[in-house]
């Protein structure tokens, strides 16, 4: 499952995902402001990239549309550790994937079960499920 779907900018909340400048990001902060008597509300989003540590901001009318990535959360088993990469097998489809070793997830070793997600044709290991 890859791609995006449109969503209203004013409906986004902290913790949801959004695409800013072609980069899938997690919303860290939102600020709504109404400029005055004549004018629509504006929304300022601050977001952090999912796959790369980059901070993004977006400002627009609350009624405007913005792309939201379709995220597929899956489970896999670590088959091998290969330096800066991890080879995992999907537990539903049994396909093998080679993903970059995450720096923010502890306890990755051969044989452990992990949760990973796919968004916009990219993959990331998010947590260790069982050791």
From Swiss-Prot:
Disulfide bonds: none annotated. The modification Hypusine is found at residue 37. GO terms for cellular component: cytoplasm. It is found in: Cytoplasm. Its main location: cytoplasm. GO terms for molecular function: ribosome binding; RNA binding; translation elongation factor activity; translation initiation factor activity. It comes from the Archaea. GO terms for biological process: positive regulation of translational elongation; positive regulation of translational termination. SUPFAM superfamilies: Nucleic acid-binding proteins, Translation proteins SH3-like domain. Gene3D superfamilies: 2.30.30.30, Nucleic acid-binding proteins. Keywords: Cytoplasm, Hypusine, Initiation factor, Protein biosynthesis. Belongs to the eIF-5A family. Functions by promoting the formation of the first peptide bond. This is Translation initiation factor 5A. It comes from Methanococcus maripaludis (strain DSM 14266 / JCM 13030 / NBRC 101832 / S2 / LL). The gene is eif5a.
């Amino acid at each position: 499952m890859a791609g995006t779907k449109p969503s209203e900018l004013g409906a986004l909340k902290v913790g949801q995902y959004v695409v800013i400048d072609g980069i899938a990001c997690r919303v860290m902060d939102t600020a709504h402001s109404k400029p005055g008597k004549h004018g629509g509300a504006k929304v300022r989003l601050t977001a952090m990239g999912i796959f790369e540590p980059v901070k993004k901001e977006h400002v627009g009318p609350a009624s405007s549309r913005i792309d939201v990535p379709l995220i597929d959360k899956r489970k896999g088993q670590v088959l091998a550790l290969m330096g800066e990469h991890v080879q995992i097998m999907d537990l539903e489809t049994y396909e093998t994937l080679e993903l970059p070793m995450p720096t923010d997830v502890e306890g990755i070793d051969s044989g452990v079960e992990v949760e990973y997600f796919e968004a916009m044709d990219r993959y990331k290991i998010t947590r260790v499920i069982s050791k």
